[in-house]
From Swiss-Prot:
Protein name, per record: 4-hydroxyphenylpyruvate dioxygenase
CDD domains, per database record: HPPD_C_like (cd07250), HPPD_N_like (cd08342)
A Pfam family of this chain: Glyoxalase_5
Catalytic activity: 3-(4-hydroxyphenyl)pyruvate + O2 = homogentisate + CO2
Binding site for Fe cation: 154, 232, 312
Keyword Repeat among record annotations: yes
Gene: lly
Organism: Legionella pneumophila (strain Corby)
Coiled-coil blocks: none
Span of the signal peptide: none
Enzyme Commission designation: 1.13.11.27
Binding note for cofactor: Binds 1 Fe cation per subunit.
Classification via PROSITE patterns: VOC (PS51819)
Alphabetical GO biological process terms: killing of cells of another organism; tyrosine catabolic process
Length: 348
């Protein structure tokens, strides 16, 4: 393994979800275009696929997934990282501060693993070590196009104030993640700091979010989720207009964006060449730099899908940012949603 990539990382292998009501998770993923392609032979565990994305819904009892759901409600209870050699990656992780994790025997994934944020787990996945590899009844081996979602782009961690350095150090010391972006976002009433980390392979990106006050959406998440964890998951598409239109038809709800946002796009990005009417109709956000060579990014955020967890749909047209130019507009949109829901009082 290369020194700069000590665990031999090569992207996300899967995300695992659990919750008090697994039917809601099944329904939500089906609405998003995922297809159940395998079921565990002995446990209530289902594998959903779309494009290269693998979501496992784990409703087994007396195991880590159930414990995570009892603490946090519905959410992502584990991540699988693709590596060249799962055993070697695990040994490196333990030697650099990782704490080994072992699930109950009946729910064992058959993968080396370490403890991660908020009682979640990171599993190491290679060609020989696949989750529940001999335990699946496979119902479909056909590729799943669904709504055109192709891969996991990034996911965020919401952390307690003062814990950002702790989790940045966790990912740096074990996996050699580096800071690739830093944001200081101020809404009208609340604010947050975000530090985006990137893996040596360039395929795993994890922004860490920390609140600057008691009322922000980060604090609301930590309160409702009963702790730190994965706040949102960004999924790639090659045609965001088609994907979003399809998701809306399936009943997926997205955050509203003020009309004034679209009036400013041509001034912000005069070179963009995107269909403005279509952007506006689907409420898709656009971002880029002054120089067209840095490319464009198109993105949209769902409302909270289960608990305080939501999804982002993202299409990268050469831009590797996170939509920094949209953060302000989005942050204020979420503040308006908080005011509507009564969790934030509007300043008068």
């Amino acid at each position: 393994m290369q020194n700069n990539n000590p665990c031999g990382l090569d992207g996300f292998a899967f995300l695992e979800f659990s919750g008090p009501d697994r039917n809601k998770l099944h329904q939500q993923f089906s609405e998003m275009g995922f297809q159940a392609v395998a079921h565990h032979k002995n446990q209530d565990i289902t594998l959903f696929k779309q494009g290269e994305i693998q979501f496992i819904v784990n409703a087994a009892s007396h195991c880590q997934a159930e414990a995570h759901a009892s603490t946090h409600g519905p959410g992502a209870c584990a991540m699988g990282f693709k590596v060249k050699d799962a055993k070697a990656a695990f040994q490196h992780a333990i030697a650099h501060g990782g704490i080994a994790f072992q699930d109950a025997p009946h729910a064992n994934h058959g993968l080396p693993a370490i403890q991660a944020i908020g009682g979640s787990v990171i599993y190491f996945v290679d060609e020989e070590h696949q989750p529940f590899s001999h335990e699946w009844n496979i119902t479909s081996s056909e590729p799943v196009v669904g709504n055109g979602l192709t891969a996991i782009d990034h996911l965020t961690h919401n952390v307690y104030r003062g814990n950002m350095d702790k989790w940045a150090s966790f990912y740096a010391s074990i996996f050699n993640f580096q800071e690739i972006r830093f944001f200081n976002i101020k809404g009208k009433m609340t604010g947050l700091v975000s530090r985006a980390l990137g893996s040596p392979c360039g395929k795993i990106k994890i922004p860490l979010n920390e609140s600057k006050d008691d009322l922000s959406q980060i604090e609301e998440f930590l309160h409702e989720y009963h702790g730190e964890g994965i706040q949102h998951i960004a999924l790639n598409t090659n045609d965001i207009y088609k994907t979003v239109n399809g998701l809306r038809k399936q009943g997926v709800k997205f955050l509203d964006v003020p009309d004034t946002y679209y009036e400013m796009i041509n001034d912000r990005l005069p070179w963009h060449k995107e269909p403005l009417n279509q952007l506006h109709a689907e409420k898709i956000l656009i971002d880029g730099e002054a120089d067209p060579k840095d490319g464009l990014l198109l993105q949209i955020f769902t409302e909270n899908i289960f608990g305080p967890v939501f999804f982002e749909i993202i299409q990268r047209k050469g831009n590797q940012g996170f939509g920094e130019g949209n953060f302000q507009a989005l942050f204020e949109a979420i503040e308006r949603d908080q005011v509507r829901r009564g969790t934030l009082k509007e300043l008068t």
